[in-house]
């Protein structure tokens, strides 16, 4: 569903970012302004601030604003309900489970489903399961847009002084 997006937009769609103006601009580019109010991200401040300090929390500063925007865009394109996209009963979540099962096996089920700090359902995983998912992404990097988006734009994935960005830049 993201075929016609730029690499920057794809990178912010999988990011857990610092909330800088660069991150906010990329996340906002995913949605028409009329859909901005549908975002269910928590209110937040930029993680790292230089110069003039931001004191008013906004949804776009949330480290998951790009994920939320991309999911809303995908829901629109698929004709899914956009009002409840963060619920574990939403078609998006079932699609997410299928992607995880691609790496962990079709019969895999999480022991627990909870809500994370970004408002999304999150799954319980063992360290071995997480490693299998990351290994699967690396193994399929030539067939998967996620790897290319992250390596093309590591600063959008995390940002200044973030371990994920540093690792991507070092290994790329």
Language-model region placement:
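Active-site-proximal alpha-helical segments within enzyme catalytic domains
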Residues: 1, 121-151
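Short secondary-structure transition/capping segments
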Residues: 52, 56, 130, 157-158
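Conserved SxxK-family serine transpeptidase/carboxypeptidase catalytic domain
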Residues: 144-172
């Amino acid at each position: 569903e993201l075929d016609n997006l730029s690499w920057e937009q794809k990178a912010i769609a999988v990011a857990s970012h610092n909330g800088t103006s660069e991150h906010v601009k990329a996340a906002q580019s995913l949605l028409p302004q009329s859909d901005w109010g549908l975002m269910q991200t928590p209110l937040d401040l930029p993680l790292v601030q230089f110069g003039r300090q931001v004191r008013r929390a906004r949804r776009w500063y949330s480290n998951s604003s790009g994920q939320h925007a991309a999911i809303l865009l995908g829901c629109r394109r698929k004709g899914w309900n956009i009002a409840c996209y963060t619920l574990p009963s939403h078609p998006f979540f079932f699609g997410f489970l299928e992607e995880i099962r691609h790496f962990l096996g079709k019969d895999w089920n999480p022991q627990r489903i909870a809500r994370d700090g970004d408002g999304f359902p999150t799954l319980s995983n063992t360290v071995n399961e997480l490693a299998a998912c990351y290994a699967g992404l690396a193994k399929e990097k030539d067939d998967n847009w996620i790897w290319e988006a992250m390596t093309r734009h590591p600063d959008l994935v995390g940002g200044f002084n973030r371990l994920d960005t540093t690792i991507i830049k070092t290994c790329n």
